[in-house]
Amino acid sequence: MATKIELIKELRKTTQASMMDCKKALEQNNDDLEKAIKWLRENGIVKSAKKLGKVAADGCIVLHSDHHKAVMVEINSQTDFVARSQELTDFAQLMISEVFKKATPTTTIEEVTQYELQGKEKVAERLALVASKTDEKIVLRRLMVFESKTNHIFSYLHANKRIGVILEVEGKFDEQDGKHLAMHIAANSPQFIDQDNVDQTWLANETSIIKSQAKLEVQDNPKKAAFLDKTIAGRVNKLLIDICLVNQKYLVDESKTVGQFLKEKNSKVIHFVRFEVGEGIVKEAVDFASEVSAQMKK
C-alpha cells in the first residue's frame, strides 16, 4: 500500500498541483487518488486533465546577474504567444529576483518551485495560476547558477529572450569583453571550452560516424581510399574547431580565434552555459484540421 508521501508525489506528477494542494486533496478524499484528482479539478486548482499531456516546447529564458553571480532559468510554455504574455513576463521577473537572492550552484529547479514570492505565495502556486489564466501547460525546465568571489561573471540575453548565456572568466576582462564573448557563445553555440574539455565518449561516437561516412565515400575509388586516414583526421579536426570555443573565429574580430583573444587579455574561460528555449524537446505535431476539430469538441 502506497504511503502518504508516495500518494502526494503521484498526485503532483499527474496534476502538477502544489504539494500543499495535493496534501489537502488527499485529506479531503480519504487518500483516494482518483477522487483527489477530481477534487482538484472541481476546485479550479487543476483546470483540465487534457492539458497535462501537451508538450511545453516554447517559452523564454530569464536571467539576472552582477559581476560575481548569475542565475538563468528556462521557462517552457506551449506557444510563443503565452511566452510573450504579460502574465508570464511578470511571473518570470518576480521568480528570477528570488532565485538570484536565494539560489546557489547546487540548488535544483524543484527547490526553486518552493521559494516564496515577496513572502507570499510559492513559485509553484503562482505558476499554476499563470497556467490557469493562459490555459497552457507552463513549466520551469532548468536552472543554472554561477557564483565566484574572485572571477568575473558575465551574461547575455538575446532580444527574443530565447537564448541566454552565462560565463565565468578568470583574468583581466572588462564589461564589454564579457558581453562580447557571451554574445559570441550565443551566436556560435560551442559545446566545450577546448579540446581538453571534450567528452571523450561523445568524441569517440562522432569519430566512428565520420569513419563510416568516409569509408562509404571511397569504397569504389582506390585513389581516394589511399588518403582515407587523412580525410578522417581532417574531418575530426574540423569538428573540434566547430565545437570548441577557443578554436572558433571570434565574432567581434574574425582575424583571430577566441583563444587568441583570451591570450591577449591574459584571461581564461572557467565555465560557460548556453540555454536555448526548447532544445532537446520534441514538439508535438498537430495538423490544422485536427486542431480545429479538437477546439470544436471542447
Swiss-Prot record:
Compartments reported by the entry: Cytoplasm
Principal place of residence: cytoplasm
CDD domains assigned: UBA_EF-Ts
Assigned GO CC terms: cytoplasm
Similarity-based family: Belongs to the EF-Ts family.
Gene that encodes it: tsf
The protein's role, per its UniProt record: Associates with the EF-Tu.GDP complex and induces the exchange of GDP to GTP. It remains bound to the aminoacyl-tRNA.EF-Tu.GTP complex up to the GTP hydrolysis stage on the ribosome.
Record carries keyword Protein biosynthesis: yes
TM regions (residue ranges): none
GO MF terms held by the record: translation elongation factor activity
Record region (Involved in Mg(2+) ion dislocation from EF-Tu): 79-82
InterPro entries cross-referenced by the UniProt entry: EF-Ts_dimer_sf, Transl_elong_EFTs/EF1B, Transl_elong_EFTs/EF1B_dimer, Transl_elong_Ts_CS, UBA-like_sf
NCBIfam families per the UniProt record, alphabetical: tsf
Full protein name: Elongation factor Ts
Source species taxonomy: Bacteria, Bacillati, Mycoplasmatota, Mycoplasmoidales, Mycoplasmoidaceae
